[in-house]
Amino acid sequence: MIKNPKVLILTAHYGNGHVQVAKTLEQTFRQKGIEDVIVCDLFGESHPVITDITKYLYLKSYTVGKELYRLFYYGVEKIYDKKIASWYANFGRKRLKTLLQVEKPDIVINTFPIIAVPELKKQIGISIPVYNVLTDFCVHKIWIHREVDRYFVATDHVKKVMVDIGVPAEQIVETGIPIRSSFELKINPAIIYNKYQLCKDKKMLLIVAGAHGVLGSVKELCQSFMSVPNLQVVVVCGKNEALKQDLMELQEQGSDALKVFGYVENIDELFRVTSCMITKPGGITLSEAAALQVPVILYKPVPGQENENALYFEKKGAAVVIRDDSEVFAKTEALLQDDMKLLQMKEAMKSIYRPEPAGHIVDTILAENHAEPNHIPIKSPVLAESFT
């Protein structure tokens, strides 16, 4: 029995989602009295130069490298086998081995598909339980390894796909994707309208433009939406200062139809009062939207997990997917004028949402590692041969 386990959470800075999930899990462990929690960007610490290059290429996939990323994501999915797994497992291996020897964690959690842990576990015979927390509404084979003890997934759909691949159903827990605790609180909307100087009598369109130029023609879009009667447009630019300054010129023309913000710490507050939102289909953003039942317009998904996320939400009736710039204004305006459709999308979001996913995950992990002395986590009896 582990009375006060040491927890190692491994993540990667490819987008903010994986790191955000890691931090949310860390906070949840601490809230439950587990103080010895380490969060490590394994690839960033092990291979900083390679990581910087691949992060740059990842961000470029949003704008000019879509076909390259499509080839990588779906190509690896098709040919993933023991040779590729063995090659990929070497990334971060040396740093990980040092971490395990020095820190001696009792539990390891991956919020990014890092198979160095289960590979080391298999090769040197360590008995640390390993948990994978999937951060999208789909699954790539790179997440799967027979030495992983349990998987936490967003939906029953993901679980079914994994079972079809060969993962035993008892190793998969449908919890939802961990989101910041602020998204699970109740707040009086009047406070939010006052804080951001918004008009409660107008519909609101929230545009999450991001910091990497992934949403095209934002200024032109805002100009078009500003002409729509009884609509207030709110743009969150993140850390994109150039975009913020560009849009501030529009805002300063005197119209109250546009509000421009940079980085918003408590962005859940804007989610709570918007009629719908234009954004990219990242797994965490979609989970946050589901928590607050925000209808989403998903802008030009990148091939790979973004596209798979978008297809899932579109099929569920929770999202409108935009695949061409020419569709953005017309489809968004039509949705804003269709109250019945907005209500249906809210209900669809409600059906997708799983309450308190971080708490569910942490409680499950702690229960398994406190359950009995010498507890042995469930093992995969057999997995597809390609998963090593």
UniProtKB/Swiss-Prot annotation:
Protein name (record): Processive diacylglycerol beta-glucosyltransferase
Catalysed reaction equations from the record: a 1,2-diacyl-3-O-(beta-D-glucopyranosyl)-sn-glycerol + UDP-alpha-D-glucose = a 1,2-diacyl-3-O-(beta-D-Glc-(1->6)-beta-D-Glc)-sn-glycerol + UDP + H(+); a 1,2-diacyl-3-O-(beta-D-Glc-(1->6)-beta-D-Glc)-sn-glycerol + UDP-alpha-D-glucose = a 1,2-diacyl-3-O-(beta-D-Glc-(1->6)-beta-D-Glc-(1->6)-beta-D-Glc)-sn-glycerol + UDP + H(+); a 1,2-diacyl-sn-glycerol + UDP-alpha-D-glucose = a 1,2-diacyl-3-O-(beta-D-glucopyranosyl)-sn-glycerol + UDP + H(+)
One GO cellular component, as annotated: plasma membrane
Record EC number: 2.4.1.315
Naturally occurring in which organism (per UniProt): Bacillus mycoides (strain KBAB4) (Bacillus weihenstephanensis)
NCBIfam families registered for this protein in UniProt: PRK13609.1
EC top class, as a word: transferase
Source species taxonomy: Bacteria, Bacillati, Bacillota, Bacilli, Bacillales
Listed pathway(s): Glycolipid metabolism; diglucosyl-diacylglycerol biosynthesis
Pfam family, one: MGDG_synth
Function: Processive glucosyltransferase involved in the biosynthesis of both the bilayer- and non-bilayer-forming membrane glucolipids. Is able to successively transfer up to three glucosyl residues to diacylglycerol (DAG), thereby catalyzing the formation of beta-monoglucosyl-DAG (3-O-(beta-D-glucopyranosyl)-1,2-diacyl-sn-glycerol), beta-diglucosyl-DAG (3-O-(beta-D-glucopyranosyl-beta-(1->6)-D-glucopyranosyl)-1,2-diacyl-sn-glycerol) and beta-triglucosyl-DAG (3-O-(beta-D-glucopyranosyl-beta-(1->6)-D-glucopyranosyl-beta-(1->6)-D-glucopyranosyl)-1,2-diacyl-sn-glycerol).
